[in-house]
UniProtKB/Swiss-Prot annotation:
Amino acids binding chloride: R200, N301
Alphabetized InterPro entries for the sequence: A-amylase/branching_C, A-amylase_C, Alpha_amylase, Glyco_hydro_13_cat_dom, Glyco_hydro_b, Glycoside_hydrolase_SF
Gene: Amy
Organism: Hypothenemus hampei (Coffee berry borer)
Record family assignment: Belongs to the glycosyl hydrolase 13 family.
Database matches in SUPFAM superfamilies: (Trans)glycosidases, Glycosyl hydrolase domain
Protein name: Alpha-amylase
Glycan attachment residues as annotated in the record: N423, N449
Catalytic activity: Endohydrolysis of (1->4)-alpha-D-glucosidic linkages in polysaccharides containing three or more (1->4)-alpha-linked D-glucose units
Amino acid sequence: MQHLSILLVVLGSSIAFAQHDPHFADGRNTIVHLFGWKWGDIASECENWLRKKGFAGVQISPPSENPIVSGRPWWENYQPVSYDLKNRNGDEDSLSDMIKRCNNVGVRIYADLVVNHMATSIGQGTADHSYDPGSKSYPAVPYSNENFHASCDIDYNDAASIRNCELSGLKDLDQSQDYVRGKIVDYMNHLVSLGVAGFRVDAAKHMWPADLAAIFGSVNDLNTDFFPSGSRAYIYQEVIDTGSDPIDNKDYTGFGSVCEFKYGIQLATCFRGSNPLKYLENWGTGWGLLDGGNTLVFIDNHDTERSSGSYLNYKESRAYKAANAFMLAHPYDGITKIMSSYDFSDNDQSPPSDGDNILSPGFKEDGTCTNGWICQHRWSPIFNMVEFRSVVSGIELTNWWSGGDYQIAFSRGTKGTIAISINDSLDSDVPTGLPDGTYCDVISGSLSNGSCTGKSITVSGGKAHISIASDDREAAVAIHANAKL
């Protein structure tokens, strides 16, 4: 019996460790959140853009049935009515087709998993199912009143209340029940069978770690049509822990990664100029971040860009692009995620639509988006830095340099160098490990047909002369081995 217990512990540990692996194809990095996109449009984007630019994966909107809410706010997606795969983003056939097409070009799909709660908005479901939040009846699953925690308001100073009471009035499932666990596992297995590589777990902070560990440990291995035998779903969990919360994000790292919310908060203070950039020399655990092997990191997400002034977003374009460039250049080894937004003036605003139907993005000649889509993943300072991250992968940070509080530069060995200046102008020689020669700055432009579409940077004697004016469109310059003329 003792040998059996040891075996179970070892097997459990192996599964938990495997759930930190995002299953990126070789030479790729970074997940992009194509927030609100239709499944068919994501499939095309995988084939026509993401595969060419080195992106590793896409986080998609929750695929489950949700209420049809007046005005079609984005958050209706986060109120499950059932686990049927039909909503504004598409149906099961289009979802399955998208997952297959993206996998076929080396781009992985991560589903946003909403299993903390069920819908509280009244209406009809997008798969035409009826339900009654008042009596906690969701017959298409089915769930009934006995499958939920008693209704109560959350006290955010109390961990049990956070996990057992209702988030914004949403009906709180009791994941300690075998029946509820089984329904969630069935839903996850359905998505695994279609070929997803993993899950972003919404509101994980509001569920007990032991319950999530049991659920994730019961999910099938990934589909062998796309992944090696025995592969486990990558799990990254929304556990908001800014340092003063009663819930510790480390409690969730035994069975998956966590979204490191402190990452974007801390960088926002630096790139807005309220905390000197020069202090980023020890960026990482020295700033209170978790070890990178347990984290997914980002500058903003779909919630923070709407609800929190503590984070940068696309509306602060210069600082935002520089912060994303820093994230993609730095060796902190959390999985990086880029936000791809649509323009909004109202925090509840629907994705671009003609009413009920989401509009597809259009594209300008330079590759940027139209039809109300922001598409940060198509901005050259961002997609070029995804390539930078691949070029310098596995190489330590060297040649840290600061020319004042808000001017920094560093290298990644002999493969890449980035310089950043906010507030003041920079006009200095900075050390770089790159071989002598002329390089294209991949922030202001690209290397195209043997010439630079943006700035050219000359490296001589191990140094590069960097000029960034305070009114330049971009606050950063980056060069790497693959951008040499």
